[in-house]
Amino acid sequence: MQTVLVKNRTWIWAVAAMVAASACGPKNVSKTTGQAYNNPKWGGFANPSYRGQETGPGLVLVEGGSFTMGSTEKDLQFDNNNAERTVTVNSFYMDEVEVSNLQYREYVYWLMRTYISYPEVYQRALPDSLCWRSKLAFNEPFVEYYFRHPSYKDYPVVGVNWQQASEFAQWRTERVNETILDREGIIKYDVVTDANDDNTFHTRTYLAGQYDFIKKGKKPLSDFSKKKKKDQKRFKVNMEDGIFLPEYRLPTEAEWEYAAQANIGDVNFNNVEQKKIYGWNDYTIRIKEEKEKDRGKIRLNAMVGKGDFGGVAGGPLNDAGFVPTPVYSYWPNAYGLYNMEGN
């Protein structure tokens, strides 16, 4: 979390005694030394052009800000573990939808195909399908079919613990950055032949220069530390080039609650006008103000009454959410995120 106060930082200011340096100077000239960037004559310090971070696949930008985090109800049991407080969250990217069975099956398939000599890696990543079992409930069809059957491919994956989810996020980091390098023509990567056991792409290992099995692509970068142009082809990307995406990870508690509240649609002159129970401006889970044909429909997948998980068969108000619904069900919130309530 970033606070207003700046601590443990040293700011260096260069002060000219007589004449202040003009802000209008050559774009690729250092304002510290006056030497040219990207010039072998001056050592070849690189200042690559950077147009901003690209949005990773399936992500949505969540604009940061301050919000009130914690429970609004009185702490009758005095647990003191969720008191209301003001928290500031930096801008971040978040998945548009929950991770689906199809996406997670892609992950475990990659592990099975890649770590041939280490089958336990694949076994360790499989979700716990036994989480469906419950006393006095017949959920065996979900135990057998929910994760594997194509009918459920767009449903959110369940039975994944924190460790498995963190490893999935790390795997996704490597695959996205690997794809970017191949797309930009910097490397020529064949997943089938090049990825096996220990020979798999990892961003940090790549940055450390530990890979010798990756083939060079057709569009190298420039190495300005070499004077001769024929020697200036560079096939290794550095973090300073701005090509790699940051690491994927699980959202923090504050980030998740901030994204779920979605107060961005209720701001008036730097103030949030009202607290919301849900991600929309209403106190009910049913649609009331839309067209008559939509009026009364449920906005989220939730149990609407004791034992009522899906509504009445054939009725217009049936949400059909007997189990988690597909990840693109219902309307997104103000940030464009789906199923931040219910499901």
Predicted regions and their residues:
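A short glycine-rich, aromatic-capped structural motif
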Residues: 51-142, 153-177, 342
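Bacterial N-terminal signal peptides that target proteins for export
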Residues: 2-12
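Basic K/R-rich, polyanion-interacting modules in nucleoproteins and related proteins
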Residues: 42-50
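C-terminal motif of bacterial Sec signal peptides marking the signal peptidase cleavage site
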Residues: 21-23
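Functional-site microenvironments in short loops/helix caps that host divalent-cation chemistry
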Residues: 27-41, 61-62, 68, 73, ...
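Sec-dependent N-terminal signal peptides
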Residues: 12-18
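Short, flexible, solvent-exposed loop/turn segments with mixed acidic/basic and small polar residues
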Residues: 9, 78-85, 145-147, 236-238
